[in-house]
Amino acid sequence: NDLYINAKQKNPDAYNDIEWQKKNIPFMGELILGHLRYGTYGGNNIQSCHPFRRQNNWMARNLLVAGNFNLTNVDELLEHLVELGQHPTVKADTVTVMEKIGHFLDKENDRLFKQFKEKGLNNFEISKEIQKNIDVASILVESSKRWDGGYVMAGMMGHGDAFVLRDPNGIRPAYMYKDDEVLVVASERPVIQTVFNVDIKDVAELKPGYAAIIKKDGTFTEQQIIEPLERKACSFERIYFSRGNDADIYRERQQLGRYLVPQVLKAIDYDLENTVFSYIPNTAEVAFGGLVEGIDEHVNKIKATEILKLGANVSEPKLSQILSSHPRIHKIILKDAKQRTFITDDESRDNLVNLVYDITYETVKKDVDTLVVLDDSIVRGTTLKQSILRILDRLHPKKIVIISSAPQIRYPDCYGIDMAILSKFIAFDAAISLIKETGKESILNSLYEKAKAELLKPKEEQINVVQEIYRTFTNEEISEKIGDLLKPKDLKADLQIIYQTIEGLHQSCPDNLGDWYFTGNYPTPGGNKVA
């Protein structure tokens, strides 16, 4: 970076002086708060970027907030701010959270000011005492009382205190590392391991309902802020979002692939000789590795059986022929690594998917082979229908089997993932199509009235009636219909879609059982309301 190079060249003697660095080089404070964000419920613009800042001339009243979160009850929280005497101008959970924390930060400042004023201190002395004595935990306890959602909330105060608070269900991930010199909190464990070169055992998970609190003087405490509830850590983090180089996530994604083996073998009628295996996108590579390992085990059992059948008639040619059998694995479809269609805004996604994929030619026997391609998830099906299936069809496979390492995504996420609109899910479209095809439209009218009735109840009493839409059909029936909906009219190959089972998901990711987007079982009352 030119700023650092120029600073060192112009001030070689002062460059290693910490106080000089703080005054002259960017990002050299004791506290650093950064965040990577793209729009989920909010917009993709500079105004949506974290951290958010609440300014004040009093040092201890300044506040920066950044977070990985969505709250489901913004309307309720805004009403509470109005009850407190505020007049919010923006309806957004980021601003609402900042103002809630800011309100109780102001109250804590007022309490301490009064306390030290009564002791006879002047205003300058009082400011210093406030900075030493602010009770960050009590501010967070009061601020978070009505929050409903999944969140890891990080904040810094102008005088130098900082905190990171995790939701009581542990929906959003948070990890921390601490030694004599640094304390770091991040949403992903391998990032901490890489930057600080530390062992996995030295990186701890921030407990649900707890806050990591760092005081200006460097003291650290981990304090319970909210009563922890049933752990429902987000399983989609493990399937797709989080880095695949986390030791546990790597193993879990491999298992997700392994659990698909029986369904895949059935789909190809156990004909491995005429089947080619591949994957898309790159994030599916680890799950694909697990799938291949499972297929390999199946092949090895066949080899062992064939060898035993030879008995005394074993010969080198026969043995070589048996041992030469193995799954056919190719990098069939290539994706531009710079493009990620899942996190592209809806208007751009359709145009983008046609530009980012290409295929490897002469890898498939025309009109003979079945082509099996693993994807980590199928949310909208946009990429498959608009681009991937047509591109794969150019290789002239007899059949295309698309397998998802995630179960069918059936319900909206309201805790921080870009899966917010029910009607855009291909699984929802499939269920609605089946209802109409079987003459059961009355179910939809009944559910619509039930949903309206639920919304009249307090959110704590609401149930997710949308689940009834899917109960009429089996998972296999919905998967088959998804295949019908995603198949382009000009596709020559047969098409089959296979999804991970809920059992396979839970067996693979036993510590992350949050599965509301698959099952509709939301961990907070606000989730049912959103659905």
What residue spans do the PLM features occupy?
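Conserved short alpha-helical segments that host acidic/polar catalytic motifs at enzyme active sites
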Residues: 1-207, 213-276, 280-281
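Internal, charge-rich low-complexity segments
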Residues: 1-11, 84-86, 90, 94-119, ...
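PRPP-dependent phosphoribosyltransferase catalytic core
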Residues: 144, 159-161, 166, 173, ...
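Phosphate/ATP-binding catalytic cores across multiple sugar-kinase/actin-like superfamilies
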Residues: 146-149, 252-273, 286, 291-294, ...
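Short glycine-rich phosphate-binding loop at a beta-alpha junction
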Residues: 270-283, 401, 495-501
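Extended, hydrophobic alpha-helical segments in both membrane/secreted and soluble proteins
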Residues: 277, 284-291, 295, 329, ...
